[in-house]
Amino acid sequence: MRISIFGLGYVGAVCAGCLSARGHDVVGVDISSTKIDLINNGKSPIVEPGLEELLQKGISTGKLRGTTDFAEAIRATDLSMICVGTPSKKNGDLELDYIESVCREIGYVLRDKATRHTIVVRSTVLPGTVANVVIPILEDCSGKKAGVDFGVAVNPEFLRESTAIKDYDLPPMTVIGEFDKASGDVLQSLYEELDAPIIRKDIAVAEMIKYTCNVWHATKVTFANEIGNIAKAVGVDGREVMDVVCQDKALNLSQYYMRPGFAFGGSCLPKDVRALTYRASSLDVEAPLLNSLMRSNTSQVQNAFDMVASYDTRKVALLGLSFKAGTDDLRESPLVELAEMLIGKGFDLSIFDSNVEYARVHGANKDYIESKIPHVSSLLNSDFDQVINDSDVIILGNRDERFRALANKTPEGKRVIDLVGFMTNATSEDGRAEGICW
């Protein structure tokens, strides 16, 4: 394929070297004549192991060249990758001047280009940037229509400096955000020879995936550091702790706790978070991330309440009261907290949970109910159909399989709030079901 790459920094230079090495005809474009001279002489504009050899091969075989002439590069190619920087502004927002400038240059050339051209945003941009910035500029400057006259896609990169060549050749996945199927097809053809799954999504989803991955990596580093700091303060080697923690692939390093949804609860997690952060504080160990966990958890309960309150009705069914399906344990259940908030604000609440029957609650659960919701016996109803029929808003609170059907086929005249991810799609067909995170 004939490819032009705009921006020859870390991402652009690596892409130019790797794509030309795989037989594609690549034109590297940059406003810096110094970078272009380096490329055309087979020299790397950045320090990256193995890159200079790829660039030399590309130049010697005629598969790679560099230019400062934007228009010539666009006319000579079928696909353009935008790899320019998106640095931070002082307020933390992204500086999009470079992307906007490149899009204008591409758009002006597309106005007179007869063949279809595909524009791929490889730069890291916030969700909505392509839809609200890139496409409008391209359409305005070209006088053409995205998805009809030219293609648009997003292709987030997962390259790490110092291992970028290996990361390109052996990616964990290839993410394609496509404005239209034809654009996705063109981009997919570049990566089919790589041994990695190709995941095609909408553009905004692809934009968000990149940020989610990077923020998750930052979170893991911060988490490990805070655990290490606390461990050292109590005389433990934090490396030993994390080595063992990372051996658990069923829970610790898995999808199990990585599903967006409702707050955590139960007799362990809240208690243990509080205990560890208290100990850290008593030892004068700073743990900002860990200290934020309970606040964030409480905020998610508030989000669920706000969703209920947004509807013009007071009759609410809460399906599930225990913190998870298959147990009657109500200790620190976020659903109990939600029920308490609803009752306190005057909602007419009915609760169904087959595992929680007041007459059979003993010990800690009985004490917990009597201290948090003394009148819970009058709110619990073992008649599932009656609870549904007597409500206007139905909250799916835990993953009891009996609740699943309500997420995708909302009863007539009802609203459903899904806290657990039973909804098959982000929106229900009738528009009367809504997820807390989707």
UniProtKB/Swiss-Prot annotation:
Q: Reaction catalysed? A: GDP-alpha-D-mannose + 2 NAD(+) + H2O = GDP-alpha-D-mannuronate + 2 NADH + 3 H(+)
InterPro entries with a match to the protein in the record: 6-PGluconate_DH-like_C_sf, GDPman_DH, NAD(P)-bd_dom_sf, UDP-Glc/GDP-Man, UDP-Glc/GDP-Man_DH_C, UDP-Glc/GDP-Man_DH_C_sf, UDP-Glc/GDP-Man_DH_dimer, UDP-Glc/GDP-Man_DH_N
Write the signal peptide boundaries. none
Catalytic EC class: oxidoreductase
To which pathway does this protein belong?
A: Glycan biosynthesis; alginate biosynthesis
Query: What keywords tag this UniProt record?
Result: Alginate biosynthesis, NAD, Oxidoreductase
Positions that bind NAD(+)? Y10, V11, D30, K35, T86, T124, K271, R331
Q: Which domain of life is it from?
A: Bacteria
This enzyme's EC code(s): 1.1.1.132
The residues listed in the UniProt record as binding GDP-alpha-D-mannuronate, with positions renumbered to this chain, are E161, K210, N214, H217, N225, Y256, Y257, R259, F262, G265, K324
Could you tell me what this protein does? Catalyzes the oxidation of guanosine diphospho-D-mannose (GDP-D-mannose) to GDP-D-mannuronic acid, a precursor for alginate polymerization. The alginate layer causes a mucoid phenotype and provides a protective barrier against host immune defenses and antibiotics.
Instruction: Name the family the entry cites.
Output: Belongs to the UDP-glucose/GDP-mannose dehydrogenase family.
In its UniProt entry, what is this protein called? GDP-mannose 6-dehydrogenase
Its taxonomic placement starts with: Bacteria, Pseudomonadati, Pseudomonadota, Gammaproteobacteria, Pseudomonadales
